[in-house]
Amino acid sequence: MKRQAVTLEAIAERPNLELACWKAARGRQSCPAVARFLADRTQQLDALAAAIVDERAPDGRASRFVIHDPKRRVIHAACFADRVLHHAIFNVVEARFETMLVDSSFACRPGKGVHRAVLAVQRSLQRWPWFVQVDVDGYFPSIRHDLLMALLRRRFKGAGFLALLQRILDCGATAGPGRGLPIGTLASQHFANAFLDGADRFILDQAGVGGHVRYMDDLLWGCESRAVAEASLAGLEAFLRDACGLRLKPRRRIARSSEGARYCGFRVRQGVVLPGPRKMARFRAAVARIEAARTAGWASEADCQRAWDGSLATLSGCDSGGFRRRVLAGFGYSLEPGCPSN
């Protein structure tokens, strides 16, 4: 594949930075740091353009916080100028990142996403009698910068641009020099998604294997027999160790497709997709909060209806009508909020 030439001047062009600024600010205009940047947008973008061309970007500042839903993760939020920089870069190179990936990779891609990944898993379970499911142990902290940069150099050229990517990696080395990507930045998402493309292609090259699905570091593929499943798993484990410096989590699964799989928070069966335990618990908690606010008079009926509409997003993409009715019955309701009485 011919490498794409990228210049710092292309990234720093004013229309590109304006578009990047709009993307980075979308939904965050009320944030103080974003509001300050936007209030002085012309000078801020001029300064960012100069920093890009003069090879002083990125700024490198980031705030760090921890979330616990669905599991403990350390999130690094880049300063707003760096978020604009990341969008400016991927305005230019996202199309090439798309061509790097197989069609069965679903994270951080337009027209893909979790729900399409879950439907692809269901199709795999319907077609193949066995499946393998694995995920990478400590994926983001384990990514080696030298291997990632080698991959990027095979796809892009331009000394200034590649040096910019290296500086971004250096600023986000979360596991010591030369290792780790920060969770929470646009660049990290694209880098991490591309880093496992070789593993995708390794799986798809195996005989008796198909129905491959990957959402970031959560992989599932179908197999014609248990023997093929075991062989493909052993091969992938060796490939990740030798070519990527990664290892799989101890909990890897080989099972008959008729047993179904849990994937991205859903319980996927050959004939139905159901919410997983965390999604159900999150929905129950949301309904309890809405009911408490309504009973105490803290929220109007319209506020409660809007909150209810938001809580339904937790269960989108799966068959959840029966579960919702059971939860609501526990609060004395026979109909969902907003439904007509007949």
What are the residue ranges of the model-derived segments?
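Acidic (Asp/Glu) carboxylate-rich active-site/surface patches
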Residues: 112-113
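Non-catalytic, polymerase-adjacent accessory regions of viral genome-replication enzymes
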Residues: 1-46, 341-342
